[in-house]
Structure formats: C-alpha cells, structure tokens
C-alpha cells in the first residue's frame, strides 16, 4: 500500500502538505501541542523505572546436588560458597584499612552533644588511636595474640570502635559485655574467657566490676580502662583489691610513646566471642573468626551489588547494640567502603533528633522500632477521613512497590509521606531489619511510605548475623528471603512437632564459612548446635515457599524472640510465677511480632477464696475468676515474684487472662506426663491472647 493511501485512510495530510497543515492551525493550538509534546517527552525521560532484580524472583534458590535437600542462592558465579568479596579485605583489620585507603582520609566516626552538629573523627585519626591504644595495652601486660581476650562494656560510641580496631590490629579478641546480661552472667564471662582487662564507658560499670573482685568472684581481672572521666577515689578503691584503674586517654598516650608495629590477624583467627544472654543456665560464648564476619557481609554485598551497592558517601546511624552481631556486620560494610558511622546520643528518645542532624542513608532497625513508627503514623491520622486518605495513598504507593518501583518523589510523597521521610533525616536509601520477624503489614506499609528499599534478614549469632536476606526487587512480605551466597540451608525432620523435610518443612540448618567455630569452653553445647557434618541447628522451624524463599513458622524449643530481639524462655518464667499462692497453673505466651508477654492463669480453687478474702474480695470461685480487682492483685503478686527472682522487664507478663478450668490430659492441654502442650494451649486460648494484646497496646 502506498504512503499516500495510508495517510488518506488515516485522514492525515500527505508529507508535502504538512507545512500547510501546521500553518492552518491557530497559535493557541500550536502552543498547546508544543506543551503536550514537552510533557510527554519529560514523562518519557523521567518516568519511574522498575528496579531490575538480580535473578528470577520466581526461583531465588536452588537445590544443591547430593546434599540431602540443601538449597543455595542462585546469585553468584558458581557452586562455591562465598568467603570474601574483596581480595584485600579478608580480615576485619583489612576491612578497615581498605576503607582508610579509599576514603582519602575522609570522616569515619561521628558523635554529637545535645543540640549540636555532629563532630567527626577521620579514618586516619581512628587508625592512629587504635594503634596507640593497642600499643598501650601491650605495655599493660596484654599480648598480641588470639589468646588475649579484651572485655568491652560500653554503650555505642566512637571509642567502642577504636577499642575493637585496636584488638584487631594486634590479633586480640573482643568480648562484648552488656547490661541485660546481669551481674551473674558478667562474672561468668570474665572467668570463662580469662579476661584480665575490661574497657568500660562509665564509672558505674567500673564499680560493678570492682565489686566482683572485692568479693573474690573474678580474681583474674587486673585492669579496668575508662572512657569517661572518673574520681581519684575509684583508682584508690581499685588499688585495695589489686585492680589498676586507668583512663583510655592515658593508655593511648602510653602507647604513642611506646608504639608497636601492628600484628595483623589471619582469616581463620578468632575475632570476637559473643556471649548470648541465654535463657537457662550460663550464657554461651559464640566464637567467630575474622573469616566468619567477612563471609557474612560479603554475602550481603553479592546480593545487593547490582542494585544498591554501598558508597563512600553512605552514612549509617548507630543505635542498635554493638554487642550484637547484626549491628557489627552492617557497620563493617560501611567501613569497608569508606563510609561514615554516626552514633546516637545514647537516649533512644532523641533518635529522631539525631537522625535529622545526621541525615543517614543506611538505617538498621529491629521490628519493634518499625512497629512504633507504624503506630505513630496512624495515631496522627486521628479522624476517619485522615485515616482513609492515608490508607488510600499507601495503597497507591504499594501498587508501585509491587511493580518494582521504589521512589520518594510521587504525588503521594508530596501530600502524605515527605514528613515521615524527613523525620529520618530525608536521605535514607536502605533500611535493614533483623533480630526478629517483621510484621508483613508494617513492612508493606513502610516500604511504600518511606520511599526506600527495605530489606529483611534472618539469622543468629552462631552464623555471624544473617543466613537469609531479601532479594532486591522482591518486596513481598511474610518470608525472610533466600539463602545468602555464603551459606547453604537445609530443613531436617522434627518428628515430635510433625514437620517433615520431604514436605518442605523442618528445622533450619545452616552450613558455610559464616558459621561459628563453637562455644567457648563448652563442648557439650557446641555438639548440640553443630553436628558432625558442620551443620548449625538453629532450633527454628522453617518452610520453603515456591519462589525458593524461607518462611519461619515455629520454634523447635520453647524459646523465642520478642519483637525487640530479646530471647525468652517461657517455662523458666512459668516456674517462677507458679510460686504465687493463688496460681495453680500458668501458660506464658510470647509472639515474635509483639514486644511483651501475656499469660493465661488458672487459680487454685482451694487457695483462691481465702487469698482473695484477705484482700477484701469475696465470692464464689467462678465469681472470683471474673473479678478485675483480683486479677490485678494476682498479676502484681506474679510480677513481685519475678522481680525477686531476677527476671528482666521483658520477661515479665504485662497482662493476664483468668481461666477457671484446669489444664488436663482430658481436655488435650497436658501430655500424659502432665507437661504443657504449648501449641495446643496457644490455639485453645487464641482469642483471649489476641484480646490481651489489643487491650495492652
């Protein structure tokens, strides 16, 4: 068909008549056409583009041959597990030196005083101070070897990192201590790890350590170094029990005068011993090598390399405890690329103020903080209209997220979400959440509202931090991503809970270069965690989803994490509460998506009436079980016993339901040996538990 015929059919002018056609149009029409063309051109060049995932999101992991059903990431260059990302960064010492080299001696560690801007230590300043401190430690009877354990008992601050780097510079091993361990656990750690030197931030912590020495509980402790100023009386008190008290500055000055050449570690050398708080018995010291930590964050780098790779201008806000590996691994990623880490002032209530001053680009969080953000946003939508508009805007942005578009410049951002983004400093491009499962509802909303990439990981200290991670581009919720390229994951049968690997369910086991070497001086518990083939048994129950991602569905042992990441052993708590006079039976319930515990209490029919009468409350057993004042009194008595027994606040129940009928074998809530059947109790009291959480929020 000829061109003229086509144009005639379409009723368009022939090419020779185009000039006459445009001359026939009015000036207003021509301007309008030009404006429309400009708008279309602008939209075409600036339209939001979907993020390109690094793999097929319908197949994010694949089965490993001859491995008993283990799966691996499809991201990577071959079947070999990833041990490192950079050849010049195979130890934590080399990681920091790489950052020093590529940063051009840029800013490294930031801190601020109230209502002041951030002040920065450069990479070279940090490296110099680390060498001075390490040399000073050598002058105080420490040795440059992996048998030398140095305790660090401090809140997040630049000095923490300087101490850590000082240890790595001279092949020493870091042993973090933290408040929630409790005095007994700290005493146990100092003795088990043969710690002679502890570096603390505040004089109060030095006093706590001295009290142990004075009671002859930690005879090996000989040197306490303080970051903050202290009174001369503290030094004198230390002298009386044979402990030298020094300021960190004095030790650095000593090291500067007696500088020693670095003694760098090897990848297989021990870098850190992380003692988990434990729920029964003494804490366990997970031994992690330099290679473990490097392998773990290298897996993260491999997964994200094509999408959101770390940069020198990245800034991380540090407020999650440095004693936990999740924070340590994320920070290592930043140092490796010459980025900056700014520390919060130490008060979580001022975190938003710190973020506005710092303007971080990377924001590691725990689900509890995400829940708070979500609740605060919706609490401000205090009318039905505001809430409807907020939900409408979120749905529009969630539709974009589902199509792979992540942005913060849409009309919905301008109208609704920019203030939320500004409260985080306005520059966040990546949020990483871990330590406990995140609510799919909260995660889905915040991915839309915050206009940045939000990743979720799963793991534990024993596999350094993470073993699974969200694949970029997969913004679905309700799972913890695919295996990292540094480890394999397999599920094994849990017969007693009716989970079978052949059905894609079972206990999660991890094997790879990020898996720890065992528990310090604890071969029995090491054998429980690590089998003869090197598989770490996590105790969590997982399920493979069709896309090759992992979903956490249960816990093998009755130990779980709350939303803030704290481990809780309900049976230990129940054994304390059962000592309350009116309590005959109790079931303590926790949820990884909630921040506190609740309980189901069955009162003792013989004790309850007289116990209530002493408190001025009378009635039949049935009446007493519905009495709100009596329920309050029982809860107060339980909490009292909990405090006397040393329970932490997160181990105390915040609300209870009184149930009048006893748990029994007949009603299916007890085993024949009269042990609680926890899954059945959870299901039986599902409605009451939901009500307790809704009332207590």
UniProtKB/Swiss-Prot annotation:
It catalyses: a long-chain fatty acid + ATP + CoA = a long-chain fatty acyl-CoA + AMP + diphosphate; (5Z,8Z,11Z,14Z)-eicosatetraenoate + ATP + CoA = (5Z,8Z,11Z,14Z)-eicosatetraenoyl-CoA + AMP + diphosphate; hexadecanoate + ATP + CoA = hexadecanoyl-CoA + AMP + diphosphate; (E)-hexadec-2-enoate + ATP + CoA = (2E)-hexadecenoyl-CoA + AMP + diphosphate. It is an enzyme of class 6 (ligase). It holds the Pfam family AMP-binding. Its EC number is 6.2.1.3, 6.2.1.15. Coiled coil: none annotated. Keywords: ATP-binding, Chromosomal rearrangement, Endoplasmic reticulum, Fatty acid metabolism, Ligase, Lipid metabolism, Magnesium, Membrane, Microsome, Mitochondrion, Mitochondrion outer membrane, Nucleotide-binding, Peroxisome, Transmembrane, Transmembrane helix. CDD domains: LC-FACS_euk. It is a single-pass type III membrane protein. It is found in: Mitochondrion outer membrane; Peroxisome membrane; Microsome membrane; Endoplasmic reticulum membrane. GO terms for biological process: acyl-CoA metabolic process; long-chain fatty acid metabolic process; long-chain fatty-acyl-CoA biosynthetic process; neuroblast proliferation; very long-chain fatty acid metabolic process. Residues 46-697 are cytoplasmic. SUPFAM superfamilies: Acetyl-CoA synthetase-like. It comes from the Eukaryota. Its cofactor is Mg(2+). The chain crosses the membrane at residues 25-45. Expressed predominantly in erythrocyte precursors, in particular in reticulocytes, fetal blood cells derived from fetal liver, hemopoietic stem cells from cord blood, bone marrow and brain. Catalyzes the conversion of long-chain fatty acids to their active form acyl-CoA for both synthesis of cellular lipids, and degradation via beta-oxidation. Plays an important role in fatty acid metabolism in brain and the acyl-CoAs produced may be utilized exclusively for the synthesis of the brain lipid. Belongs to the ATP-dependent AMP-binding enzyme family. It is linked to A chromosomal aberration involving ACSL6 may be a cause of myelodysplastic syndrome with basophilia. Translocation t(5;12)(q31;p13) with ETV6. This is Long-chain-fatty-acid--CoA ligase 6. It comes from Homo sapiens. The lineage of its organism: Eukaryota, Metazoa, Chordata, Craniata, Vertebrata. The gene is ACSL6.
